[in-house]
Amino acid sequence: YEQWGKEMLGRLRGMFAFAIWDKNTRTLFGARDIFGIKPFYYYHKNGHFMFGSEIKSFLAHPGFVKELNEERLPEYLSIEYIPNEETMFRDVYKLPGAHMFTYHDGQLEIERYFSIEYHIDETKSLDDWKKAIAETFAESVKAHQIADVEVGCFLSSGVDSSFVVNEVAKGTPHVKSFSVGYEEEKYSELPYAEAFSKEIGVPCITNKVDADSFFEANKNIQWYLDEPMPNPSEVPLYFLTKNAAKYVKVVLSGEGADELFGGYPMYSQAVHFMDYERKVPRAVRRGISGIAKALPDFKGKHFLVRGGQEHWQRFMRANYVFEDPAERDQYLKKDYHAKRPEEYFKPYFDKVKHLDEPTQLQWVDMHTWMLYDILLKADRMS
C-alpha cells in the first residue's frame, strides 16, 4: 500500500478482506477479494463506522443498534438469502466482492475495482482450450498450496473436489483428504469418496452425521452464520470442517467450480432455450407459453411455458421456497410489496444483456448465489 496505494489491488491474488489505516491522510482504506470469498461487514450510522468479518463483532459496541431488517424477510422466504449488500440486521451491509472503500472525515465511499469480463478467443480450438484450462488449473492448485502449515483437501464424490485432490496428490502424494457422510448409506457419498481416494493412493479421513447430531449442531451453526441461512448442506460441512481442523489448518475445496465451468443443469438447459429462440419468433413463443400454461400437465410443458419468458424470468433455482408472493405473504404480518423471486435478479441480467444465456446465468450466479450463499456458508463453517 505504501508503494502503490489503491493500485495494489491489481497486484493481489487469492482471497482477502482487509482494512488499512493511513495515518498520514487519516483515511481508512479497505477491500474484499474479487469473488467475495472472505467476508467484510460494515455499519455506518450516528457517527459510528464499524467493520469486521462477523456481524456479531459489532454487538460489543455501545453505539450499535441491533434491529431486525424486516423489509428483507420476503427475499429470505423466497430464495433463502438476500441477493444484495443488505443483511438481516438493519444498517449492517456487506462490502461486495471486487469492491474497495475509503472512510475519511465521516464520509464513506465505495467503488468497484475489478469486473468479471468474458472475451472469447474464437481462433482457439477445443483442444487449445482444454490444454489452457488444464495448465491454468494445475498452476492455480500449486499456488494455493503455498503455506507455512500442512494443506489438506475436502473430498466428496463429485468431479470438482476430486480434480483438486488428484492435482494436489501429484506433488504431495500423502496429502490428507477429508470426507463426510450420513449413517443412512443411501444418502451418503462416503463409499465413492473412499473408493476414489484409494484409487489415487491418498488417505481419506472420514466422519458420519446421524439425525441426532444433525439437529443438535444447529444452534452452534446458526451462531457461526450470524444470519438465518437454511441451506441444509451447511450441517455436514460443519462436521467436515470440525473433523479436518484436528489435522490441518488449511484446506482446498471445489467450491465455485459449477459457476466457473457451467456445472448446473440450468446452464445446459439455457443452450436449448437459445436454440428455441433462434428458430421460433418471440411473439409465437409467448403465445405458445400462454396456451401451454393453461393446459393440464404434459411432457415438455415446462419448457414451452418458460420458452416464452425473458431470461431473468426463467432464472429458477432449486432452492426457491415460495414462488408465488401471495402464498409467501400469508406468513407475514405486514405487506412489504415484495417481488416474485426471479424479479430480484432482473437488475443483474440487465447488466449482461450482451452475453449469451448460459453465460448470463453464470455471471448472475457468481454475483448472487455464489457470493451470498455458497462462499458465505463455506467461510462460516470453516
Predicted regions and their residues:
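ATP-dependent adenylate-handling active sites, centered on carboxylate activation for C-N bond formation
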Residues: K23-M50, Y118-E343, K377-S382
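A short, charged helix-loop
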Residues: E342-D350
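A short catalytic or substrate-binding loop motif that flags glycine-/basic-rich loops and adjacent residues
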Residues: G10-R13, D33-F35, V92-L95, A244, ...
